């Protein structure tokens, strides 16, 4: 029978081995992807999760706070970006063209995905953990499962402007816990840069803009001892510096857990 000291030594050596292996596997993230657009393609690794033809998360949500990403306008063409893509929530809503050329089942044609979630797997400087549907969309027609069977792919990507259908307008979802002293707003369906770096609101009849703070994902909030009175005009600034203003988009008598879209 092995002595207790021998057993402890084996356990310790095994732990060192695992720690070393884990350390070797870690790849530092690349520089943040910014709101710059062009023809240059960058290299990345891609994996997929969830159902083979699904939108990723079981609840069709993700770390950005969006819901129903399996439905229009996202239609399951979504992905989790690693640190330089997700950017602690500031990458939420940004759009990317992605493509793969290997294995042979890859079409080599670019498809567009929207960042709706994050991933922290340190396997490459840039890593997209895609929905099963988005991953399979890089395949030749009829060979989607062959691509998904690869599990992990080398791909090329570039940031592109987001283009939503004409009937999909910027939308502001007032989060569940909101009340006159606490207002949290999720911003989605932003054309152009897609991601938002600042949100302000203004009460009807007042000149002062009230700055909201980042809460999490694509959610912005304000806590105030003074009761807020709707309607609210909302202004957001995208990463590229574009400001957009939506007058009285959140109406008087607004309700929590309700979405309000621009006209």
UniProtKB/Swiss-Prot annotation:
Localisation per UniProt entry: Secreted
SMART domains the UniProt entry points to: DPBB_1 (SM00837)
Residues the record marks as carrying a glycan: 32
Organism: Lolium perenne (Perennial ryegrass)
Keyword Glycoprotein belongs to the record: yes
Expansin-like EG45 domain location: 61-167
Entry similarity comment: Belongs to the expansin family. Expansin B subfamily.
Residue ranges constituting the Expansin-like CBD domain according to the UniProt record: 181-262
Protein name as it appears in the record: Pollen allergen Lol p 1
Signal peptide: 1-23
UniProt xrefs under PROSITE patterns: EXPANSIN_CBD, EXPANSIN_EG45
Any one annotated GO CC term: extracellular region
Phylogenetic placement of the source organism: Eukaryota, Viridiplantae, Streptophyta, Embryophyta, Tracheophyta
Keyword tags: Allergen, Glycoprotein, Secreted, Signal
A biological process from GO: sexual reproduction
PANTHER family hit by this protein: EXPANSIN-B1 (PTHR31692:SF21), EXPANSIN-B3 (PTHR31692)
Alphabetical list of InterPro entries matching this protein: Expan_Lol_pI, Expansin/allergen_DPBB_dom, Expansin_CBD, Expansin_CBD_sf, LolPI, RlpA-like_DPBB, RlpA-like_sf
């Amino acid at each position: 029978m092995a002595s207790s000291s021998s057993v402890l030594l084996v356990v310790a050596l095994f732990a060192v081995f695992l720690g070393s292996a884990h350390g070797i596997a870690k790849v530092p993230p690349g520089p943040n992807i910014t709101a710059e657009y062009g023809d240059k393609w960058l290299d990345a690794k891609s994996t997929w999760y969830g159902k083979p033809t699904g939108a990723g998360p079981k609840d069709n949500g993700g770390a950005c706070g969006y819901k129903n990403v399996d439905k229009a306008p996202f239609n399951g063409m979504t992905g989790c970006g690693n640190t330089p893509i997700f950017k602690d929530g500031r990458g939420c809503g940004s759009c990317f063209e992605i493509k793969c050329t290997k294995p042979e089942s890859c079409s080599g044609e670019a498809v567009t995905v929207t960042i709706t979630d994050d991933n922290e797997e340190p396997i490459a400087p840039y890593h997209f953990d895609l929905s099963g549907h988005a991953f399979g969309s890089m395949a030749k027609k009829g060979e989607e499962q062959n691509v998904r069977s690869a599990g992990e792919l080398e791909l090329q990507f570039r940031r592109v402007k987001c283009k939503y259908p004409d009937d999909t307008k910027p939308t502001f979802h007032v989060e569940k816990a909101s009340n006159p002293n606490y207002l949290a707003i999720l911003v989605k369906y932003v054309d152009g840069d897609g991601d938002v770096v600042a949100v302000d609101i203004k009460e009807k009849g007042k000149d002062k803009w009230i700055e909201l703070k980042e809460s999490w994902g694509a959610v912005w909030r304000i806590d105030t001892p003074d009761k807020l009175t709707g309607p609210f005009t909302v202004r957001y600034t995208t990463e590229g510096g574009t400001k957009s203003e939506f007058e009285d988009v959140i109406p008087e008598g607004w309700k929590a857990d309700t979405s309000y879209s621009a006209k």
